[in-house]
C-alpha cells in the first residue's frame, strides 16, 4: 500500500516514540526526511540520527532526546501543509511558533529550512510543520 503523506508519517512516528519514551525510532528514509532530521538535530530536538542502508530506500534511525528526569524535549509536533491543503507563506508572512520558542519547518527554493533562516534570507515557501 502506498503512503500518501510520508512526512506526516515521520512526524507521527516521532510523536509516538516521544510519548512512549523510546530511545530510538526507525523511519523509512528519503532526502526530504534526512533534511528534516538534520534540522531537528541542529535545533537540539533530537540527540542524533544515522542512515542505515537496507538495499531498498534505507532507514533513518533517530535517537530521541529527553531531559534529566525523562521529560520530553519535543512537547508538540503539528503538520501544517497536507496533501489536500497545501499551506504557503510569503517572506513577510512566515509564522512564529510560540513566540519564537518553537520552530516552523519550511520548504523553500533554497531547500528545507527553519522559519528563522527563512526570515533572515528573505524567502517564503511551503510551511511543512511546527515543532515546539
Swiss-Prot record:
It comes from the Bacteria. Pfam families: Ribosomal_S8 (PF00410). Gene3D superfamilies: 3.30.1370.30, 3.30.1490.10. The keyword Cytoplasm does not apply. GO terms for molecular function: rRNA binding; structural constituent of ribosome. Signal peptide: none annotated. Keywords: Ribonucleoprotein, Ribosomal protein, RNA-binding, rRNA-binding. The keyword Chloroplast does not apply. InterPro entries: Ribosomal_uS8 (IPR000630), Ribosomal_uS8_CS (IPR047863), Ribosomal_uS8_sf (IPR035987). One of the primary rRNA binding proteins, it binds directly to 16S rRNA central domain where it helps coordinate assembly of the platform of the 30S subunit. This is Small ribosomal subunit protein uS8. It comes from Alkaliphilus oremlandii (strain OhILAs).
